[in-house]
């Protein structure tokens, strides 16, 4: 399969045309309009410093159904003991920076390049991108961020500085999404960590059907909060 070169037009080729490794297209930009269009088609950007923008739609796709979230006994104990104070949308920029820094500290390199940080901060300001923060002793101990459209949440990255911090943040996110009738969390690609939390692979065609159905519902847009009934601050 060829890799498609994007033009200035905010459109993408059919995801089914992606290569076997999931790579679909190259180029374009990270404007809010293009990013939202990509997510609505089951496509996401992923590239490293010095590379052009690469757009992916892997097959199979890793997703987590909130009702199938697996909580280990150690995580249950962590939540029961309230080791972390978890918040939503209070430190988006810091969470993104921490996700990038943790990977660099481990020598992994990061795809959260400055251009990507700016793009997702714009989505956050527009009410589409959200962060979950786990705090301990007033310090950011772990967290994650992603994008919300319809009744789908598209996870992007997570980090932890203290044991179980990111899992605690994820557990609170699952509880929040369940309360607001979200249908899935898109985890993108398979990892042992996500599989241990209950994520499962689905054929891309099945994922896209689920995506199209969930986009029929309104997006919970704005700053999220655990304190209000409607989920918004």
UniProtKB/Swiss-Prot annotation:
Keyword GTP-binding set for record: no
A single GO molecular function term of this UniProt record: leucyl-tRNA--protein transferase activity
Classification via Gene3D superfamilies: Leucyl/phenylalanyl-tRNA-protein transferase, C-terminal domain, Leucyl/phenylalanyl-tRNA-protein transferase, N-terminal domain
Protein role: Functions in the N-end rule pathway of protein degradation where it conjugates Leu, Phe and, less efficiently, Met from aminoacyl-tRNAs to the N-termini of proteins containing an N-terminal arginine or lysine.
Location of this chain's protein in the cell: Cytoplasm
GO biological process, one term: protein catabolic process
Taxonomic source organism: Desulfatibacillum aliphaticivorans
GO annotations of cellular component type: cytoplasm
Family: Belongs to the L/F-transferase family.
Enzyme class label: transferase
Top-level lineage group: Bacteria
Annotated HAMAP family: Leu_Phe_trans
Sorted UniProt keywords: Acyltransferase, Cytoplasm, Transferase
The protein, known as: Leucyl/phenylalanyl-tRNA--protein transferase
EC numbers on record: 2.3.2.6
Catalytic activity: N-terminal L-lysyl-[protein] + L-leucyl-tRNA(Leu) = N-terminal L-leucyl-L-lysyl-[protein] + tRNA(Leu) + H(+); N-terminal L-arginyl-[protein] + L-leucyl-tRNA(Leu) = N-terminal L-leucyl-L-arginyl-[protein] + tRNA(Leu) + H(+); L-phenylalanyl-tRNA(Phe) + an N-terminal L-alpha-aminoacyl-[protein] = an N-terminal L-phenylalanyl-L-alpha-aminoacyl-[protein] + tRNA(Phe)
